[in-house]
Curated annotation (Swiss-Prot):
Residues 1-26 form the signal peptide. Its main location: membrane. This is Glutamate [NMDA] receptor subunit 1. It comes from Drosophila melanogaster (Fruit fly). The lineage of its organism: Eukaryota, Metazoa, Ecdysozoa, Arthropoda, Hexapoda. Keywords: Calcium, Cell membrane, Disulfide bond, Glycoprotein, Ion channel, Ion transport, Ligand-gated ion channel, Magnesium, Membrane, Phosphoprotein, Postsynaptic cell membrane, Receptor, Signal, Synapse, Transmembrane, Transmembrane helix, Transport. NMDA receptor subtype of glutamate-gated ion channels with high calcium permeability and voltage-dependent sensitivity to magnesium. Mediated by glycine. This protein plays a key role in synaptic plasticity, synaptogenesis, excitotoxicity, memory acquisition and learning. It mediates neuronal functions in glutamate neurotransmission. Is involved in the cell surface targeting of NMDA receptors. Plays a role in associative learning and in long-term memory consolidation. Glycans are attached at residues 258, 314, 345, 397, 454, 481, 501, 693.
Length: 997
């Protein structure tokens, strides 16, 4: 009796206590050849038919060589499921474990509760004996901490969330309300829906979001208070998990609030589908083969046989435990067998049989049921395994569905509001914002009131908006019939995301600011602004089709020409100008050298005319070289030698080419249009090179900023420009005009507009990062399709083109920049001022030089006068000295002559007359100023012996024969007359003492 009590108590304690299990003894192991040849399979079944079918299936299995190896036999050991879980535990120990069962198949009546299958799972799991359930669908059995060896051929209830997602994707519903009970299964289905949707919507275009979660206590009596919240929500699609009893209460109260009629969509689980007051049009799910115990029994047996066969071929299987009273039993083979069972994937009577890590059935098929009149259930679709794609597939025949209110057309699934909260932002030319004056009470006809969003200051809310987007909004509201309240962005930003971690989770959450943040947080219904469509924004909001296609471009100020004072120097580079200047003087020097060293250049010929041109000197050579280059007439100073003249011709050809090239390039620089841009586009090396002194920027947190973040090849450029980014586009454009910013990168539409109204601005390069402007809406907004269709119609009708001409190209104030650019520029004083300044410099230089020359000449004249005075004094002194010498010589000769006459009067002698006019001194001019004093006839007569004695003797011989006698000056003088004045006749003597000075 004591032993029986111990056996009875052991399994009961095993339900709550986990014992430490000692390692299995090595002696209990078997080699592959020592594997058991017989395997007992236990069955805890709900009725006799199931027991009989279980036995029959085991017998048939033994003849199936595909699943049963040779020398292996299976036997069945069955017991009846008892509603009392304690009795069930005793029966499992006494009738199954005592017979060494390797696994247990368990089923129960659906109306009897799940406590008995749980008792079987606890008891078998304590000894690591695998349990295969064929009817238990509660979420609790998925917990492997409790049901360590339990797996099932039916899916749990919460797996219906997977089917919900497929149905929502099929019907394109994007916003739902989930209603669930607060028990384990209700919370499990909510968690499954939220978890699976995270990965499910990566593969589909339409993403469903949960707008409202309604949780209720089981066995409720009224659902009215929850319906009030549901009625104010926007979604009209209800996903409900509830028991049959709770579903009756919910459907009853929902009908009273008219929430089961037209426009509403109910998708429920299996239990709620069987409520006796399920409204017409409700869609529900029903598991295929849910009540086919025979099919599940067969599938479970064959899954078990398949696992044992593979295990036999791979490892040793120890015998199953036999004694429930042995607390030291730890059947490792049972644990390994459980792993083999979870890896099975076979095609059975109930479909494709496979399990997840929790041992729950996957690939289970469902029928989509549509409730019609008188609670008739009509199958309108199937969720089944597609063997070709190896995954589940949803097939629904929409034409067979009758929706609530007996409608054949699919409801929108959302309450469509007709009065919308709209936001916009100031961005020329799409939205112009004007503050109303103090005496104004309303906006102009083409304007709309646009106060600041959520701003309580009444004076700050008086704004009027007009522009491209406002005209589009006016036409759009007329086309799809809605009213609106328009407001301005409170912070003036389109919005960007900030990564935050408020919950301590591993992943960071994006929080949006600006217009996008208002839309994401559902404080606004629509954004009508030049909102660029990009992946980051599209993840959180909806976009209509683009109302304007555009891209990103670069705005810069048109490059100005070089300094106007030296415009005429632009045709040649500085290097070329220097080379020309050097060439002029080098050629001049070579010309001079050639002409100087040429035998026909420097020296005149003996027979040449006295008027022959002078030889070329260095200054004349420089003058010649400059004259040829500047095409001026050369009247003198040309080369004389042939070699120099050849060089002169070559230099003339060089000058012709240089002058012609200069003239052509001067026309190109001064007359033709100036260059359009400095940059070639986004691929310009000056933008990509971070070391280049070039400032570029965009707007912080804008779509352009996000584009640069995404592009890896632009990362270096983005890091450079990030510090220069502006808060608004208006500030950046003003800095471009002022020259503070060299390149502003922004949306092409805005920059083309700015360039069209200011001829000093220009867009550089081709568009990149092409996208479009769209109207932003909340995720799942019912207005998305209507807005998109209206915009497409606007494109087809030409309305959008009309807006482009009116606002983008700025027709009413646009300057004709294109005509201005194509008209040839005429040269004026501004362009040629440098040439006139050069002439002025030349004139000033000439005047300066002449002043210097005059001053220098005056200095030279003074110096020359001093030299002339000194020379005259010297000449006078020299003349006086020579006169004295002459007189003395004459006196000496006179004395000698007189002595000779007195002593011996030699015949034939003649007195020599010294006539100053006839015989002047060497270098002395003839004239009365040179007459001797006291000589009235200005002639001194002396006797000339050569005339009297020796007529053939020359004066030089006479001077040599008579020392001391001065030699008369011979040269270009008149011939001596033979007749002398009487005073100086031969033999005439006179006193010459008066001649002594």
């Amino acid at each position: 009796m004591a032993m029986a009590e111990f056996v009875f108590c052991r399994p009961l304690f095993g339900l709550a206590i986990v014992l430490l299990v000692a390692p299995i003894d090595a002696a209990q192991r078997h080699t592959a050849s020592d594997n058991p040849s017989t395997y007992n399979i236990g069955g805890v079944l709900s009725n006799s038919d199931s027991e009989e079918h279980f036995s029959t299936t085991i017998k048939h299995l033994n003849f199936d060589q595909q699943y049963v190896p040779r020398k292996v036999t299976y036997y069945d050991k069955t017991i009846r499921m008892d509603k009392n879980p304690i009795k069930t535990v005793f029966n499992v120990c006494d009738k199954l474990i005592e017979n060494r069962v390797y696994a247990v198949v368990v089923s129960h009546e659906q109306t009897s509760g799940d406590l008995s299958p749980a008792a079987v799972s606890y008891t078998s799991g304590f000894y690591s004996i695998p349990v295969i359930g064929i009817s238990s669908r509660d979420a609790a059995f998925s917990d492997k901490n409790i049901h360590v060896s339990f797996l099932r051929t039916v899916p749990p209830y919460y797996h219906q969330a997977d089917v919900w997602l497929e149905m929502l994707s099929h019907f394109a519903y994007t916003k739902v309300i989930i209603i669930h009970s607060s028990d384990t299964d209700g919370r499990a289905i909510l968690g499954r829906f939220q978890t699976t949707s995270q990965t499910y919507y990566d593969d589909v275009d339409v993403r469903a979001t949960v707008e409202l979660i309604v949780e209720f206590e089981p066995k409720l009596e009224s659902f009215t208070e929850h319906l009030i919240d549901m009625k104010t929500a926007q979604s009209r699609v209800y996903l409900m998990y509830a028991s049959t009893e709770d579903a009756q209460v919910i459907f009853r109260d929902a009908g009273e609030y008219n929430m089961t009629g037209e426009g509403h969509v109910w998708i429920v689980t299996e239990q709620a589908l069987f409520s006796n007051n399920t409204p017409d049009g409700v869609l529900g799910l029903q598991l295929e083969h849910a009540h086919s115990d025979k099919g599940h029994i067969r599938d479970s047996v064959y899954v078990l046989a398949s696992a044992i066969k593979e295990m036999i071929s791979n490892e040793t299987i120890a015998e199953a435990p036999k004694d429930c009273g042995d607390s030291a039993v730890n059947w490792e083979s049972g644990k390994r067998l459980f792993q083999y069972l979870k890896s099975r994937n076979i095609t059975g009577e109930t479909g494709q049989v496979a399990f997840d890590d929790n041992g729950d059935r996957i690939y289970a098929g469902y029928d989509v049921i549509n409730i019609r009149e008188q609670q008739k259930k009509h199958v309108v679709g199937k969720f089944s395994y597609d063997s070709m794609r190896a995954k589940m597939r949803m097939r629904i025949n929409d034409s067979e569905i009758i929706w609530p209110g007996k409608q054949r057309r699919k409801p929108e699934g959302i309450m469509i509001p007709t009065h919308l909260r709209l936001l916009t932002i100031e961005e020329k030319p799409f939205v112009y914002v004007r503050r109303m004056g103090d005496d104004e009470f309303r906006c102009e006809p083409d304007e709309r009131p646009c106060p600041l969003f959520n701003n309580s200051d009444a004076t700050a809310n008086e704004f009027c908006c007009r522009g491209y987007c406002i005209d589009l909004l006016i036409e759009l509201s007329k086309r799809i019939n809605f009213t609106y309240d328009l407001a301005l962005s409170p912070d003036g930003q389109f919005g960007h995301y900030i990564l935050r971690n408020n919950t301590g989770a591993m992943t960071l959450r994006k929080e949006w600011t600006g217009l996008i943040g208002e839309l994401v947080n559902e404080r606004a219904d629509m954004i009508v602004a030049p909102l660029t469509i990009n992946p980051e924004r599209a993840e959180y909001i909806e976009f209509s089709k683009p109302f304007k296609y555009q891209g990103i471009t670069i705005l810069e100020k048109k490059p100005s020409r070089s300094s106007t004072l030296v415009s005429f120097l632009q045709p040649f580079s500085n290097t070329l100008w220097i080379l020309v200047m050097v060439s002029v003087h080098v050629v001049a020097l070579v010309l001079y050298l050639l002409d100087r060293f040429s035998p026909f250049g420097r020296f005149k010929l003996s027979h040449s005319d006295s008027n022959e041109e002078k030889a070329l000197n260095l200054s004349s050579a420089v003058w010649f070289a400059w004259g040829v280059l500047l095409n001026s007439g050369i009247g003198e100073g040309t080369p004389r030698s042939f070699s120099a003249r050849v060089l002169g011709m070559v230099w003339a050809g060089f000058a012709m080419i240089i002058v012609a090239s200069y003239t052509a390039n001067l026309a190109a620089f001064l007359v033709l249009e100036r260059p359009k841009t400095k940059l070639s586009g986004i691929n310009d090396a000056r933008l990509r090179n971070t070391m280049e002194n070039l400032t570029c920027a965009t707007v912080k947190g804008s779509s352009v900023d996000m584009y640069f973040r995404r592009q890896v090849e632009l990362s270096n450029m983005y890091r450079t420009m990030e510090a220069n980014n502006y808060a608004t586009a208006e500030q950046a454009i003003q800095d471009v005009k002022k020259g503070k910013l060299m390149a502003f990168i922004w949306d092409s539409s805005r920059l083309e507009y700015e360039a069209s109204k200011d001829c000093e601005l220009v867009t550089a390069g081709e568009l990149f990062g092409r996208s479009g402007y769209g109207i932003g809406l909340q995720k799942g907004s019912p207005w998305t399709d209507a807005v998109t269709l209206a915009i497409l119609e606007f494109h087809e009708s030409g309305f959008m083109e009309k807006l482009d001409k009116q606002w983008i190209f700025h027709g009413h104030v646009q300057q004709n920049c294109e005509l201005f650019e194509k008209t040839p520029n005429t040269l004026g004083l501004k362009n040629m001022a440098g040439v006139f300044i050069l002439v002025g410099v030349g004139i000033a230089g000439g005047v300066g030089l002449i002043i210097i020359e005059v001053i220098y000449k005056k200095h030279q004249v003074k110096k020359q006068k001093r030299l002339d005075i000194a020379r005259h004094a010297a000449d006078k002194w020299r003349g006086t000295i020579e006169k004295r010498k002459t007189i003395r010589a004459s006196l000496a000769m006179q004395r000698q002559y007189n002595v000779g006459l007195n002593s011996t009067h030699a015949p034939g002698t003649i007195s020599l007359a010294v006539d100053k006019r006839r015989y002047p001194r060497l270098g002395q001019r003839l004239g009365p100023e040179r007459a001797w004093p006291g000589d009235a006839a200005d002639v001194l007569r002396i006797r000339r012996p050569y005339e009297l004695g020796n007529p053939g003797q020359s004066p030089k011989v006479m001077a040599a024969n008579q020392p001391g006698m001065p030699m008369p000056m011979l040269g270009k003088t008149r011939p001596q007359q033979s007749v002398l004045p009487p005073r100086y006749s031969p033999g005439y003597t006179s006193d010459v003492s008066h001649l002594v000075v």
